[in-house]
Amino acid sequence: MKLLTDQPADKRFVASVLALCALSGVLTSAWCLYIDDVINNDGVEYIRAAQHLASGDWAGTLASHHWPFFSLLMLLFGKLLGISYYWAGQLLNAGFFTASSVLFVLVVRAFGGTSQRLTVFAALVAVIHPAFNEYRAFIIRDAGYLVFYLAAILYLARCVNEPAWRYRIGVVVAFAIAGLFRIEGAVFLLSTPLLLSFIRSTSVQKPWFRLLLLIISTGLAAVVLAWWLLAPSAGIEPVAAFSAPLDLVANAWHQISASVAHKIAVLRKEFLGPYAAQYAWILFGFSVVMILVSAAFSQLTVPWAMLVFTGLWSGVCFPHKVLNRLWASLIGMHLAILTVFAVVKLFLAARYPLALSVTVLLLVPFALDHVLAAIRWHRLKTTARVLAVFLLLWGVGESISGLDNTTRARAIKDAGLWLANHTNTAGSLVSNDRRLAYYAGRHADRDYIIEDVAKILHGLRDGRWPDASYVALRLSRRSDKTESWVVEALGKAPVRVFDRETGDRVLVYQRP
């Protein structure tokens, strides 16, 4: 096929591929919104923060979300187009994810994939991999971060062949904007001098200079991460953080140490017992590693990861040695940041390794090109053929799964819309689900949204929320015991039960 030649792709060919990639992104976003039209929990927080921003309530904004830039964009976009904050967030996310797909192709080309075949392979990855599609129906800031992270990597790669100042400035600006979406962007911004040193020839740079940059970047990143850890609870301003950086890092280290010590104590008491208490640190370290591995493979998916490992095992690399060093450095930095998150929180949300996965995927077009060139189907043994077909079908299935996230929360939306006609005053609804409160128009009543059902029942028994006229509880479909417990605790049956074929159910109670 002419599309899959080794000839360099001209401007018209590249423009055609990028246009098809963008069109596919728009259609994919429309499809994902069609099959999942229920807002996500984070989306409620962003909308709540945007509403506080619109009223000039910065304290309420930061109470809703400590990283309000995306909410500010939703506010501006909504005002500009005259649409709701919900649709402003959805349109922004659709644009960001589509731009990420296009930028991914450009980054692969900047890393040496300039042929027609590699350009097509890059577009194929950007169109079908779940990392680009799985969260299109969500209102999240990660998509904005991913766009500007990829833009920074594009400028870094272009600095290799043309060390122009405009590319260096582009790296700084892109990382700075990425930092407005997620803390990782700020860490990469402070590490920019180190990353720029990686793309310089080792013959013109002293090892001690690179070591000095590493120490400085690590120190600045430690200050930023310490502020990120302490700011939500202590209300520390960024300027104040850098005015006393050593105290900030010391306080953060003390908090991390106390948190880890508590986790170790729990492991000793609940899992190991007195005769194996000395293995608590080993179990903790193993837990952190497994959290990292599980989150990374969950986002990258096993078949795609095996393709990358196969390529690395076969010696696949980028054409320029410096780009290999840059790629490895970016992956190492992502793993270091995720390790800090895992140690502090002992969990990683599924989308946290999103940028890491996209970085790893940069090698996939080159690995795919190598594998297809090396495989001789007629020479493969039966076992190898079966394995190849199995991995291919697995990879296709993983790709389809990113486009098959049909909502399981329609009962929540139905209940919220029904309650919207019955809970018109502030404090009239108590619920354990933010999405339900959003559709009922009561998401601004933060004190009336409690995720723990037991706390709601105890609060009702103690006379909390006296103005609430309705109680709406989302219960898992499998939690029959919890449902009977709720009915027994409230002393009566619900006035309405919202249920669908799949997903959770909602029990609505009317208070006397």
Please report, for each region that a protein language model flagged, where it lies by residue.
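Extracytoplasmic catalytic/substrate-binding loops of multi-pass membrane glycan-assembly enzymes
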Residues: Y34-R48, T61-L76, I83-S84, A234-A241, ...
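Membrane-interface transmembrane helices that cradle and orient dolichyl/undecaprenyl
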Residues: A110-G112, A152-R168, A178
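Short helix- or helix-capping micro-motifs
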Residues: S24, F121-P130, E134, L154, ...
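Transmembrane-helix motifs of polytopic, lipid-linked glycan transferases
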Residues: L91-G112, A151
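Hydrophobic, aromatic-rich transmembrane alpha-helices
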Residues: Y279-N324, H334-L335
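Signature aromatic-anchored transmembrane alpha helix within multi-pass, membrane-resident enzymes
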Residues: R117-V120, V173, L194, I215-L220, ...
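Short acidic/glycine- and proline-prone juxtamembrane loop motifs at membrane-interface regions
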Residues: N41, H66-W67, A137-G144, A349
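Membrane-embedded, lumen/periplasm-facing catalytic core of multi-pass transferases
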Residues: A54, V108, L156, L387-Y438, ...
